[in-house]
Swiss-Prot record:
Protein name (Swiss-Prot/TrEMBL): Cytochrome c oxidase subunit 3
Source species: Trichophyton rubrum (Athlete's foot fungus)
InterPro entries for this protein: Cyt_c/ubiquinol_Oxase_su3, Cyt_c_oxase_su3_dom, Cyt_c_oxidase-like_su3, Cyt_c_oxidase_su3-like_sf, Cyt_c_oxidase_su3_a-hlx
Keywords, alphabetical: Membrane, Mitochondrion, Mitochondrion inner membrane, Translocase, Transmembrane, Transmembrane helix
Record Pfam families: COX3
Gene coding for it: COXIII
């Protein structure tokens, strides 16, 4: 029916999106989540309750938004070839903008580390900072995340070759590796001898690794949606746009981590 209407009433192949409440609700949830998070960090009592509620609400709104997009593409056939080209372009521009964001972070790091001033003790890491050994937990995390890049590439090739079982195993392995990486990153933060308040080194370290960790969480969410769709037989060897976009995003996360490990952990040690 949708194809019939598009053929008879539309002179273009593009999908005219219906009015949706999810962009507004997600923005509102993010605003409340950010505000309550800042207030919790500054010691306001019971703000963690609002933080938790805002997080649950954000996850719920994202789930419903994913549901609508999946319905439009999988069941209604609104994602034509022209729409898919536009979505691919959007993903590419999004990854490019994220790359520029990380470029600014690395610029800040090298601005301070290549020529440390007197306030830093004229050395890097600054005087009084005990940097994390790059050959301990960071090296293990490096191996884990790069291994996840191998498994996610393996499950993609299994999918396009029609090997559904191999695709499922590879995707589950990737998600498990991502979860382990996130847990180890949290352990690293908990045992670190410096905080984000310890000068420019602490700010650069926690902001860069924390922002990357946030991207790992986003990538894990995308891959989890891909796993759910794979289990629901939504994906085929030639129709898997969202799944492929999630894999591209995950490779971007891998590349950023490799640069981050070499520059901040290894060279900055």
């Amino acid at each position: 029916m949708s194809l019939y209407q598009r053929t008879n009433f539309q002179s273009h192949p593009y999908h005219l999106v219906w009015p949706s409440p999810w962009p507004f609700y997600n923005s509102l949830s993010l605003f409340i989540l950010t505000t309550s998070g800042v207030l919790t960090m500054h010691g306001f009592s019971n703000m963690y309750i609002i933080l938790f509620i805002a997080f649950i609400n954000l996850v719920w709104c994202m789930t419903l938004w994913f549901r609508d997009i999946i319905s439009e593409g999988t069941y209604l056939g609104n994602h034509t070839n022209a729409v898919q080209r536009g979505l691919n372009l959007g993903v590419g521009l999004f990854i490019a903008s994220e790359a520029l964001f990380f470029l600014a972070i690395f610029w800040t790091f090298f601005h301070s580390s290549l020529s440390p001033n007197v306030e830093l003790g004229a050395q890097w890491p600054p005087l009084g900072i005990k940097a994390i050994d790059p050959f301990e937990l960071p090296l293990l995390n490096n191996i884990i995340l790069l291994s996840s890049g191998v498994t996610v590439n393996s499950n993609y090739h299994s999918l396009i070759q029609g090997n559904r079982k191999g695709a499922l195993y590879g995707l589950v392995a990737t998600i498990l590796l991502a979860i382990v990486f996130t847990i180890f990153q949290g352990i690293e933060y908990s045992v670190s001898s410096f905080t984000i308040s310890d000068g420019v080194y602490g700010s650069c370290f926690y902001f860069s690794t924390g922002f990357h960790g946030f991207h790992v969480l986003i990538g894990t969410a995308f891959l989890s949606v891909g796993l759910w769709r794979l289990l629901g037989y939504h994906l085929t060897d030639h129709h898997h746009l969202g799944y492929e976009s999630g894999i591209l995003y995950w490779h971007f996360v891998d590349v950023v981590w490799l640069i981050l490990y070499v520059c901040i952990y290894f060279w900055g040690y």
